[in-house]
A protein has these predicted regions:
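Catalytic cores of alpha/beta
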Residues: 59-64, 122-140
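Short, hinge-like loop/turn segments at secondary-structure boundaries
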Residues: 30-32, 132, 161-165
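Hydrophobic side chains in well-ordered alpha-helices
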Residues: 98-101, 132, 190
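Radical SAM enzyme core and accessory elements
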Residues: 192-310
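Conserved SAM/AdoMet-binding glycine-rich loop
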Residues: 1-122
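Flexible glycine/acidic-rich beta-alpha junction loops that bind and position SAM and/or redox cofactors
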Residues: 20-24, 78, 83-89, 119-127, ...
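Generic secondary-structure transition motif, activating predominantly at the C-termini of alpha-helices
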Residues: 5, 37, 41, 64, ...
């Protein structure tokens, strides 16, 4: 680490998923970065770690709280909150402890939290997956990565393929196409949901608009928006920021029934703060008035709030 830092490296990504299981080792690594930050506080530095969600010793907490905004990111794998599915895939996870740790990280540190859920696991249906998404939204991580299960060579998930009628794509990345509990159409809808969520939720561009879009039932409401956006555009890629902003305005006004001036003002403020180029049509109609190491998206989440406190 010292050699890489001395040669100019300022972005570090650790892919060891057991980083936080050995507190002494993890603490030493964190202290290494804290020392460099203290020595040159104006010199940008960014460190990314994978974190086991239900294990966060005090020794690590004491170091984590000392990191400034934009310097630390944790990738945290939840995959599923369904205890039966967890047992089936041999995933031992104390969900209550994981929730406590995620809430603590969100409320007491500047760490950027990137948390994942996986759709298509054996025995999990759309309702269960949606409940898991809602549970995660309530914990307010900066990003929720919605992924589709992939078949990896030699992975034990294969032993459940027959029992749950799991059908996978024949080409990489070998994503699941359907299971006995999640239809092919539902898998496709979740895949579109994931793409649109990345553009709207994970992008950090719409902190004022997102809470009104999600309301009291985040998964159901965003899935409805996702289905509507697909019917409107027929696209999941090459959607410019102004296209998304205009779609959000149309949804809020035409579907949700929100006052146009109110919806447009929030979306326009979000859009302007995000630094996106271009001007959505509703803004043109007049309906609404330096160096860093952290990636742009993380900076938006630090300076804004993806999921404001309720």
């Amino acid at each position: 680490l010292a050699s890489l830092h001395a040669r100019g490296a300022r972005r570090f990504r650790f892919v060891d998923r057991t980083f936080n299981l050995k507190a002494a080792t993890g603490r030493a690594i964190l202290e290494f970065f804290l020392e460099r930050i203290a020595a040159a506080p104006d010199e940008p530095l960014f460190a990314h770690f994978e974190l086991v969600p239900d294990h966060l010793p005090d020794a690590l907490k004491e170091a984590i709280v000392r990191f400034p905004p934009g310097a630390l990111q944790f990738e945290i794998g939840i995959q599923t909150w369904n205890p039966e599915v967890q047992a089936r895939i041999s995933r031992r996870q104390d969900d209550a402890r994981a929730e406590v740790n995620l809430r603590w990280l969100r409320e007491h540190t500047h760490a950027h939290l990137h948390v994942d859920l996986i759709a298509g696991l054996p025995g999990e249906d759309l309702a269960s997956f949606g409940a898991g998404f809602d549970r995660l939204v309530a914990l307010r991580p900066h990003e929720i990565q919605v992924g589709i299960l992939k078949r990896l060579r030699g992975a034990p998930i294969a032993r459940h393929a027959r029992a749950f009628a799991m059908r996978f794509a024949e080409r990489a990345p070998y994503e699941v196409l359907e299971t006995s509990t999640m239809s092919a159409d539902e898998i496709v809808r979740v895949a579109r949901f994931a793409r649109y969520w990345d553009l709207v939720g994970n992008s950090g561009r719409f902190p004022r608009t997102l809470p009104t879009l999600l309301g009291p039932a985040p998964f159901a409401r965003f899935m409805a928006f996702s289905d509507w956006l697909w019917a409107r555009t027929g696209a999941t890629h090459r959607l410019a920021a102004e296209t998304i902003a205009e779609a959000l305005r149309a949804w809020r006004v035409e579907v949700d029934g929100a006052p146009e001036a109110e919806a447009a003002a929030a979306i326009a403020a979000d859009y302007a703060d995000s630094g996106a180029r271009g001007h959505p049509a509703f803004m043109a109609r007049g309906l609404a008035g330096g160096d860093r190491a952290a990636p742009t998206r993380q900076v938006r989440h630090v300076t804004g709030t993806m999921h404001p406190r309720r």
